[in-house]
């Protein structure tokens, strides 16, 4: 999920008056794209990758739903995944003074790394975190999926064992809040 990114900007005609301002802001965020990313983009835009995208979405959906199903509890508030590669669990009844301190404790106690909600503009005292669920061998998982609509929990356990282990550790840790 980490790595180099490439973006583009599409603006409806009725918002053209904002285009120069948007370009100026955008140039500070994602200009000077590195050469490997440019070559990858050319390849990506030339081919038909619809089956690939459906399969990858199916895998991320299955893994995300596994994380959601196994974390939601009276100690952890969490919404189901909606297309990203991370979830935003909120820890209830927390004894920590900030989401950053909460994440530090979780990392120390479980080995699970999360980002504090305060890194994303939430109030530091809100015990909201961001948890990525991409710690798995995507190539191996992809190779073993034949039907992206029916990825079982067993497949998630087999091909995303680090995610499964992390969710288990996090769930057990939260029971002591």
What are these regions (language model features)?
Residues 95-101, 139-142:
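Short, conserved charged micro-motifs
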Residues 105-114, 120-177:
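PLP-dependent enzyme catalytic core of the Aspartate aminotransferase-like
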Residues 58-68, 78-91, 127:
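Conserved glycine-rich beta-strand-loop-beta hairpin in the small C-terminal domain of fold type I
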Residues 1-58, 68-69, 150-153, 167-168:
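Conserved core segment of the aminotransferase class I/II
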Residues 7, 41, 60, 87, ...:
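Generic structural signal for small/hydrophobic residues in well-ordered secondary structure
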Residues 71-79, 176-177:
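Surface-exposed helix-capping loop/turn segments at secondary-structure junctions
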Residues 74-78, 113-118:
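A short linear hydrophobic-aromatic micro-motif
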Residues 12, 46, 90-92, 134-136:
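Residue-level recognition of strand-loop junctions within catalytic nucleotide-signaling folds
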